[in-house]
Design a protein with these regions (language model features):
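Positively charged n-region of N-terminal signal peptides that target proteins for export
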Residues: 1-5
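Bacterial N-terminal signal peptides
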Residues: 8-20
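Signal peptide processing junction and immediate N-terminal pro/mature segment
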Residues: 20-28
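Extracellular ligand-binding/catalytic regions of CAZymes and related secreted enzymes
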Residues: 27-36, 63, 214-217, 226-281
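Helical hinge/lid and interdomain linker segments adjacent to catalytic or ligand-binding clefts
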Residues: 30-31, 38-42, 49-128, 132-134
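Active-site rim elements
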Residues: 44-47, 103, 165-169, 238-247
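Catalytic beta-strand/loop cores that center a nucleophilic Ser/Cys/Thr
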Residues: 62, 68-70, 160-229
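A glycine-rich, often tryptophan-bearing local segment used as a flexible ligand/cofactor-contacting loop or short
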Residues: 106-183
């Protein structure tokens, strides 16, 4: 009887160890919960329907990735719109990416501009949409600025200097080969504004060009900013609500967010855990 017990005990222990190993292995195989990316959308100012676009962008972008978008909105429709979120010393703390969609062309205070840019210089990625390219301008911004000059800082962050646009007409968009555009189909917008580009800074990579009549220029691009090589992605497309709500536009912008945060594969697909949890409508 003792011999049988001695034989059964090791077998039972072996079975228990196997069960423990299997349970541990199964637990290890379960994917860890991935926290959503946190984005801050700064939006408001002159010349656009930002009251509607803030909600269009939040809904459309959150639908396309494991992403939470907080909104810092100013109802001020002037070119001197200011934003309460910028009043905090560490205003970007806790966010993985800042989406700039403000149109504050006549905010020229260098202290304010420095506070806005400091998080990006420290490594917080940036995504810039349409009117952001025409914000924080001073001096003779109609001419190419000099690198390092007081009126160059915002343009250096953007990676490109734009000063104006023509009348609204459809823009034919053609993509370049890049992870942020992989798999995206060329398309034509409704009536939109084609921004001019009077200076493209070294290191800026063209992602898309837009053609409107006989004029063709860069409409989406990316670069690395400052000593930290912060990833910054931008597009000048996005004036009208219909364009902002267009699936092709939202697909482009979400690529910029994922690329800038390092959550985009070379095939243009989100990194594991950052794909949308439900099918895009």
């Amino acid at each position: 009887m003792k011999a049988k017990l001695l034989l059964i005990l090791p077998i039972a222990l072996l079975g228990l160890a196997g069960a423990t190993f299997m349970a541990t292995g199964q637990d290890a195989a379960k994917p860890a919960t991935v926290k959503p990316l946190r984005a801050l959308l700064v939006i408001g100012g002159c010349c656009h329907d930002y009251a509607a676009q803030k909600d269009i962008l939040k809904a459309g972008l959150e639908e396309r990735a494991n992403l939470t978008v907080d909104i810092c909105y100013s109802p001020d429709k002037s070119t001197k719109a200011t934003f309460t979120c910028y009043e905090k010393e560490n205003w970007a703390e806790g966010y993985d990416v800042i989406i700039h969609n403000e149109c504050s062309a006549d905010i020229t205070d260098p202290t304010v501009i420095k506070r806005i840019l400091d998080p990006h210089l420290s490594g917080t990625p940036g995504v810039n949409l349409h009117g952001a390219m025409h914000s924080y301008r001073s001096g003779n911004y109609g001419k190419p600025v000099t690198a390092g000059a007081g009126n160059a800082h915002w343009f250096e962050y953007i990676g490109l200097q734009s000063t104006s646009h023509g009348k609204q007409l459809p823009i034919s968009i053609t993509y370049s080969a890049h992870a942020a555009t992989a798999g995206l189909e060329n398309w034509t917008t409704i009536n939109e504004e084609l921004y001019n580009n009077i200076q493209i800074f070294p290191g800026t990579e063209t992602l898309a060009k837009g053609k409107q009549g006989d004029s063709e220029t860069v409409v989406a691009w990316a670069h690395e900013y400052g000593d930290k090589k912060t990833k910054v992605w931008s597009t000048t497309i996005g004036h009208n609500n219909e364009t902002t709500a267009d699936a092709k536009y939202l697909d482009l912008v979400i690529r910029g967010i994922l690329w800038s945060t390092g959550k985009l594969g070379a095939d243009g697909k989100p990194a594991p855990g950052y794909a949308p949890t439900a099918a895009v409508k």
